[in-house]
A protein has these predicted regions:
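Glycine-rich, acidic
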Residues: 1-131, 135
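Glycine-rich, small/acidic residue-mixed loop/short-helix segments
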Residues: 103-207
């Protein structure tokens, strides 16, 4: 993952990786460092990224080859904590942490992922019904002012002293300099720029 991900991967593969040939949210079989891989053009963080799936026996050699190929850009591994923060800054949801069994695409502003004009598919009827209903609550990104403490995940959200939702994810963004997160908020108040209260502290619904 990173701004040079495509250039780095191209050094290890003869297969075309340009954005026209291999666009976002597509997958294909390519050869990387001599290993056949299922490559997926997507990212968990807000950067150009690829997922590579290949036999575990090739993992050490692949790791070494990627780090060697990336020396000109001074690439470095990053851990789970950094990944989870970057995904939150991007607004990328984690299934089961930010969602539950009642979640549908319209509740999380991901209606673009559903094509209801396709022929019948498993779950289509339920999605059609969900589309017709205004969701009771909506998942929104939020942010606090610099210097404020990061609220714990699971903290209640209130508006005007009334229960209005709950925090699903929260982290201190060291790049932005303030806490950020995701929360379920009653839909009528889930508007960009709106003010919510998390654990007694004010937060702003982000775009």
């Amino acid at each position: 993952a990173g701004p040079h991900a495509r250039d780095l991967l191209q050094k290890l593969s003869d297969d075309p990786l340009d954005k026209e040939t291999f666009p976002y949210l597509r997958h294909r079989r390519i050869t990387v460092n001599g290993v056949s891989c299922l490559a997926i053009r997507l990212g968990f963080v807000g950067e150009l990224a690829y997922e590579l799936h290949f036999p575990a026996a090739a993992a050490v050699d692949m790791w070494d080859a990627i780090l060697e190929a990336g020396k000109e850009w001074d690439i470095r591994p990053f851990g789970l904590d950094a990944q989870r923060l970057l995904r939150l800054e991007k607004g990328h949801i984690i299934i089961s942490q930010d969602t539950d069994f009642e979640t549908n695409p319209w509740k999380v502003s991901m209606e673009w992922a559903v094509k209801l004009d396709k022929p019948d598919f498993v779950g289509k009827a339920a999605l059609v019904r969900a589309q017709r209903r205004t969701p009771r609550e909506t998942l929104v990104p939020w942010q606090m002012e610099p210097g404020m403490a990061t609220p714990p995940e699971g903290m209640t959200v209130t508006i005007g002293g009334n229960l209005a939702g709950r925090v699903t994810s929260s982290k201190m963004s060291y790049v932005l300099g303030h806490p950020v997160g995701l929360a379920w908020v009653v839909t009528e108040h889930a508007k960009e720029g709106g003010t919510i209260t998390i654990g007694g502290a004010p937060a702003t619904i982000a775009g």
